[in-house]
Amino acid sequence: MKTVFAILFLAFIALTYARSYEDVKEEIKNEVVKEILEDLEEESDELDDKSKEINDAKPYRWLRNKWWRRIRPDIRMAGKK
């Protein structure tokens, strides 16, 4: 009789552990998915910010300004001759 109770008790503990293990496993899975989604949202926000900086109507404006600063004194000197 004691053996039967011991086996039933161990079976009860095993079932309880299995249910709690599945719950813990599911909770960990949900947390990981939640963290991944939050990271993706942050990265997409960063990408949106970068695209706003890159989306310029005149993307080579800085190069033209640099070129113009280098050429302007030569034009001014040519006009004085």
UniProtKB/Swiss-Prot annotation:
Belongs to the arminin family. One of its GO terms (cellular component) is extracellular region. It comes from Hydra vulgaris (Hydra). Its main location: secreted. This is Arminin 2a. Residues 19-57 form a propeptide. Residues 1-18 form the signal peptide. Antimicrobial peptide with a broad-spectrum antimicrobial activity. Keeps its antibacterial activity under a wide range of salt concentrations that mimic physiological conditions of human blood, which is surprising, since Hydra is an obligate freshwater animal with nearly no salt tolerance. Does not affect red blood cells. Expressed in entodermal epithelium along the body column. It comes from the Eukaryota. The lineage of its organism: Eukaryota, Metazoa, Cnidaria, Hydrozoa, Hydroidolina. Keywords: Amidation, Antibiotic, Antimicrobial, Immunity, Innate immunity, Membrane, Secreted, Signal, Target cell membrane, Target membrane. The modification Alanine amide is found at residue 78. It is found in: Secreted; Target cell membrane.
